[in-house]
Amino acid sequence: MARYTGPITRKSRRLRIDLVGGDQAFEKRPYPPGQHGRARIKESEYLLQLQEKQKARFTYGVMEKQFRRYYEEAVRQPGKTGEELLKILESRLDNVIYRAGLARTRRMARQLVSHGHFSVNGVHVNVPSYRVSQYDIIDIRDKSLDTVPFQIARETVGDRPIPSWLQVVGEHQRILIHQLPERVQIEVPLIEQLIVEYYSK
């Protein structure tokens, strides 16, 4: 599956948001790249909407075509479209691995899933976009438990808050999905209504 593999710090600076999490290069220069990066420019309504959509895309590591499909699915849901879109993005397996603290970034989580380190309800899953459901159980596969990424994860457990809609239990770091997240449980600096307005034009 296609994914963006370019310089993510540059995207962070362009969108004025740390897309990685703990990006020291962004923290040093949290303004757009280029000669006029520090200059204040008047941003149009369309530009603000586009930037918010791009923030969401790059935060979750989703290409435009797939993001559009997620939006169209969210439109068909009975709740608020923007909130439903965020719920869909949060339910991706790579995001769940990141939220559970088993990977430092979503990029790393995506790589771990792609390399076949996880099973869901006892079934091997290596698709980062796989969508989890309430009551799903995610396990690190036995052959992967002693690999470096998961040794580090065990040592750093608790460094980042784990959202209440999931739980990590035991030394094998099993992930339990208690529910799919509500908007108040999704901590991302996004104004989802701007994304809805962008696609509604």
Swiss-Prot record:
Record bears the keyword Signal: no
Gene name of the record: rpsD
NCBIfam families for the chain: PRK05327.1, rpsD_bact
The name this protein goes by in its record: Small ribosomal subunit protein uS4
Summary of subunit composition and partner proteins: Part of the 30S ribosomal subunit. Contacts protein S5. The interaction surface between S4 and S5 is involved in control of translational fidelity.
Family: Belongs to the universal ribosomal protein uS4 family.
Disulfide cross-links: none
Gene Ontology CC: small ribosomal subunit
Function as written in the Swiss-Prot or TrEMBL entry: One of the primary rRNA binding proteins, it binds directly to 16S rRNA where it nucleates assembly of the body of the 30S subunit.
Source organism superkingdom: Bacteria
Signal peptide: none
Assigned keywords, A-Z: Ribonucleoprotein, Ribosomal protein, RNA-binding, rRNA-binding
GO terms of biological process kind: ribosomal small subunit biogenesis; translation
GO molecular function terms listed in the Swiss-Prot or TrEMBL record: rRNA binding; structural constituent of ribosome
S4 RNA-binding domain residues: 91-157
CDD domains registered for this protein in UniProt: S4 (cd00165)
